[in-house]
């Protein structure tokens, strides 16, 4: 996969930064108002009844704060949170160890829950629904079934691909939260908050410009802010203003619509080689030398959301906005 500054997946050096910036309470969490408003009600109701919060599924593109939201939920509930991810839970014993370590009301957070092996997932069904698990101990004739009661707990699952969840697993989540790309005003506030925490000087206009080019994604906004700060220190006096922001992002190949060279390559390939489409996903992937899943999951969502690309039954189509943005003449088909 191409190493892009606009990659929505977490890079190796970003875990510490994201932990440092992580809000503790819902009223500190910027954006995602619809999800927050629902969670406030569900959390307060669970606390009033002295019950564990219903199992919660958070889904949406990478970098939008699903992990942060899980930790905020645990803080609001006043309980411990145990964190793991689907690929890490390789066998039933791994999951049993996690479940057996939970206290009443605790949160078990499983990131990338769609990547859990099916054999492990099936153990979760009774754990989520009735708070018990039955496991086999031993092998052959010496094997026996052991019934293990669990304390009431809350499972929070996070996924970028909700469609890959099995129906039985999805049905056991009482609460679902769709994390959406951030509005410009919210992302601007996030940029200014990050700058304040790390003692960076930034003008409001620069924060707006940086947010506008961050693809509606806080992770990208914070990453770009770090890079623009470097430019401000070397090419200026340390102040991040709109001029240095524009120069820095232009040098980083991030245009005014938040598109980088890969996004532009996708659109130019469609326009120059296929007359704007329709183009099949496999054909497009081969032409830009990327995996099909990478194009579908990482590049297309933002291009579609911003109106540069359409998915049709016959393939991908570049829109009039894509032609205009890249300077190509557009003829209505």
UniProtKB/Swiss-Prot annotation:
Pfam families given in the database record: AAA_lid_4 (PF17864), RuvB_C (PF05491), RuvB_N (PF05496)
Region (Small ATPAse domain (RuvB-S)): 183-253
SUPFAM superfamilies documented for this protein: P-loop containing nucleoside triphosphate hydrolases, Winged helix' DNA-binding domain
Region annotation Head domain (RuvB-H): where it falls in the sequence: 256-333
InterPro entries in the cross-refs: AAA+_ATPase, AAA_lid_4, DNA_helicase_Holl-junc_RuvB, P-loop_NTPase, RuvB-like_N, RuvB_C, WH-like_DNA-bd_sf, WH_DNA-bd_sf
Record family assignment: Belongs to the RuvB family.
HAMAP family associated with the record: DNA_HJ_migration_RuvB (MF_00016)
Name this polypeptide is given: Holliday junction branch migration complex subunit RuvB
Protein's gene: ruvB
